[in-house]
Amino acid sequence: MTTENIVSTDNVAAILDRAMEAGDGLLRLTPTWVPRSFLHPGRRLKLHTDDLYAYGAERGGIDERWFGSTTEAANEGRVWHEGLSFVSFEGELFTLRDAVAEAGARLIGTAIWEKYNRWPIYSKFFDNMGPIPHHMHQGFEDAALVGQEGKPESYYFPPQYNNVDNNFCYTFMGLEPGTSKQDVIDCLARWDD
C-alpha cells in the first residue's frame, strides 16, 4: 500500500460525508491482511501464492483477513496500518478508525459510541495450515486487573471456506522437557495464588 491516495486524519470529514451519502450510509472497506510470524498460511483466503508473504518471510505468512477493524495488529515490526480497515471511495482511502472518530454515533450508533467512544470489535477469517498454539484470552474482569481489555472470542469454520482441512483440528499444550507430574500438580494447587 502506498500513501499517495491515503487521506490524512484531519481531511477525512469531507470525503466521509460524500462516501456515506453515496453508499446510503454504507462504506466500502478494502481487504485487511494480517500475517503471523509463528503460523503458516492455510492458503484458503483466496490470495495468490505470491502474496502469502507480502510483508516478508521474517514477518510470517498472511493467514488472517480482518473485517471492520479499527484495531492495530499486535505484531512485532508491523507496518503502520496493519490490522486497520480502510474505506475506499473515489480512488482514495482513509481508515475506518478515522471515520469512526470523525462521525461517532452517526456511523456506529449511539449505544456503542456512548459506551466505548470507538468501534470496539472486528471479525476475521482465520486460515492456518496447522493448529494454533494453545492460548487463552482473558475476560473483561480478569484483563482489567492488569490494565487491559478482555477479548471475548469464538471461532466458526464455515464449510464454504474450509473445503480442505489442512492439518487441523487440534492444538497442542506443551510442557518444558523434564516437567514432572508433581510439577503440574503443584502448579494447579497454586492456581489462585
What are the roles of these predicted feature ranges?
Residues 1-181:
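Transition-metal
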Residues 181-193:
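Active-site glycine-rich loop that binds ribose-phosphate moieties when present
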